């Protein structure tokens, strides 16, 4: 399998290790922190929110400043970036910020994320973690959440390949040419959901090794997706649900293969 964009090999983690780490990530993302840490991260988020809209913006300066204030890089990814992206979206909906301004802010958040990933110093190596495809088929343009999820999954020892903003044909081709334990689709619109569902149905018809299919993204927050339950195995934005579902599916497959 093509190991591009994967997390490097480190000490092999058990399912229990992975689920425990997922809970740690969620504690940060949900703000389940002690008051001192929570206040520090909230303050850092407020600063980063303003700085990403500044004409003096620099990704390296942003990360260095936050770390100097005692905010761990993982907390920036798991809490600060998603929180600020939501705020930008709300302010655009309220006409407090223009679409152009929000686009600039989100692009700067993405550069912060890329800088942190680069600082981790991970080499592109074949890992032993379960393999996941993270897809956002064209014309999907909202990919920041998918990039955050990819980083979180890699820290949990998953191997992640991304197919973002690419035609549906590229997504299905990638699945057919590789072997994934799960395929996660990210969608912000009904159009992307329908395209993702078409990909799932095509893969189910023509592919022997069936991965677990997920639908996530901001579309789930808008409602109106109840009738699509038959197209995907799971519809969720919760990291622990994703991790537990993949682990459970792998255990079930192993038991079937042994029988």
Indicate residue ranges for each PLM-predicted region.
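Short phosphate-binding/catalytic loops that engage adenosine nucleotides
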Residues: 71, 157-159, 208
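A short, charged/proline- and glycine-enriched loop
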Residues: 125-132
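Short coil/turn segments
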Residues: 137-142
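Short helix-loop-beta junction
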Residues: 147-160
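Cofactor-cradling patches in redox/metallo enzymes
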Residues: 163, 167-224
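Peripheral docking tails and interdomain loops at the edges
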Residues: 218-259
């Amino acid at each position: 399998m093509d190991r591009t964009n994967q997390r490097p090999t480190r000490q092999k983690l058990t399912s229990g290790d992975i689920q425990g780490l997922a809970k740690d990530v969620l504690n940060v993302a949900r703000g389940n922190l002690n008051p001192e840490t929570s206040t520090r991260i909230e303050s850092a988020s407020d600063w980063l929110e303003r700085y990403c809209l500044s004409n003096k913006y620099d990704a390296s300066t942003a990360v260095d400043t936050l770390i100097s204030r005692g905010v761990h890089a993982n907390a920036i990814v798991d809490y600060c970036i998603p929180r600020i992206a939501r705020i930008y979206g709300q302010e655009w909906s309220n006409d407090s910020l223009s679409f152009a301004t929000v686009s600039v802010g989100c692009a700067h958040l993405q550069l912060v994320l890329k800088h942190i990933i680069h600082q981790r110093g991970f080499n592109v190596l074949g890992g032993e973690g379960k393999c996941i495809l993270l897809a956002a088929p064209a014309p999907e343009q909202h990919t920041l959440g998918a990039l955050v999820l990819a980083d979180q999954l890699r820290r949990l020892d998953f191997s992640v390949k991304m197919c973002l903003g690419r035609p549906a044909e590229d997504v299905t081709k990638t699945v057919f040419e590789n072997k994934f334990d799960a395929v996660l689709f990210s969608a912000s619109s009904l159009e992307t959901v329908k395209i993702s569902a078409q990909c799932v149905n095509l893969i189910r018809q023509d592919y022997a090794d069936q991965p677990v299919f997920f639908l996530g993204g901001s579309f789930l927050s808008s409602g109106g997706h109840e009738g699509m339950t038959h197209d995907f195995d799971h519809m969720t934005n919760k990291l622990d649900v994703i991790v537990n579902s993949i682990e459970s599916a792998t255990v079930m497959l192993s038991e079937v293969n042994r029988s």
